[in-house]
Amino acid sequence: MCSSKMPCSPSASSLCAASPPNCCHPSCCQTTCCRTTSCSHSCSVSSCCRPQCCHSVCCQPTCCRPSCCQTTCCRTTCCHPSCCVSSCCRPQCCHSVCFQPTCCHPSCCISSSCCPSCCESSCCCPCCCLRPVCGRVSCHVTCYHPTCVISTCPHPLCCASPPLPLPFPSPPVPLPFFLSLALPSPPRPSPPLLSPVLIPSPSPSPSLPSLSPPLPSPPLPSPHFPSVNPKSMLQ
């Protein structure tokens, strides 16, 4: 417990010697008063947490300065936005449990413990993708690097295997009607040319000997003349 016997800064000795709730005043943080577990809610103001306080319970989510990030202050329960760069924890925090999707700096990805929780759409560096979680049969959409192609996979460093083909070929996207009018119409396919069918002419077959005897030709009719009796001509 903080007491009046504990050393405080000369300018705030009267304030620091008051009750324990006032013991963690910003002017007292240079003393051992802020190294104990007696820091109360008065230490949770944004201007209170000093580097010396980061190992104590004084480091609450609303009381974590960037200077605290080199210590255990940068935990899930004490990761203040001021402790982060672009809503991600500083590299010094990458060894702690500060690996969360909302608090993971790209430089944290060099750690093997970062990838399972750091591979989110907003925070996944190529170093994560070398892990088996991204190098197997499929790559999850939320585990791609921003420079990766989302549809197929991968940044050259994301997957050791070649990019996977799409399961089905994507159908062609139809053009709008006004654009289709501006395009030249494709030439119509001409019907296939029919090759002329050559009908073979009957070749003269050699005369074969007939097995049946030739039929006799019918007798020619004789010219019809009136019959003349020679005797009647003599009379």
Swiss-Prot record:
Bias class Pro residues marks the residues at 203-224
sequence repeat ranges are 23-27, 28-32, 33-37, 48-52, 53-57, 58-62, 63-67, 68-72, 78-82, 83-87, 88-92, 93-97, 103-107, 108-112, 118-122, 128-132
Quick one: a GO cellular component term?
A: keratin filament
Disulfide connectivity for this sequence is none
Return the annotated region ranges for Disordered: 203-235
What's in the keyword line of the UniProt record? Answer: Keratin, Repeat
**Chain intervals for the UniProt region annotation (16 X 5 AA repeats of C-C-[GIKRQVHEML]-[SPTRV]-[STVQRCP]):** 1-132
Chain ranges passing through the membrane = none
Secretion signal, residue range per the UniProt entry: none
The job of this chain, per UniProt, is described as: In the hair cortex, hair keratin intermediate filaments are embedded in an interfilamentous matrix, consisting of hair keratin-associated proteins (KRTAP), which are essential for the formation of a rigid and resistant hair shaft through their extensive disulfide bond cross-linking with abundant cysteine residues of hair keratins. The matrix proteins include the high-sulfur and high-glycine-tyrosine keratins.
The UniProt subunit note reads as follows:
Interacts with hair keratins.
Instruction: Report the family membership.
Output: Belongs to the KRTAP type 4 family.
Name of the protein described by the UniProt record: Keratin-associated protein 4-16
Task: Give the lineage.
Answer: Eukaryota, Metazoa, Chordata, Craniata, Vertebrata
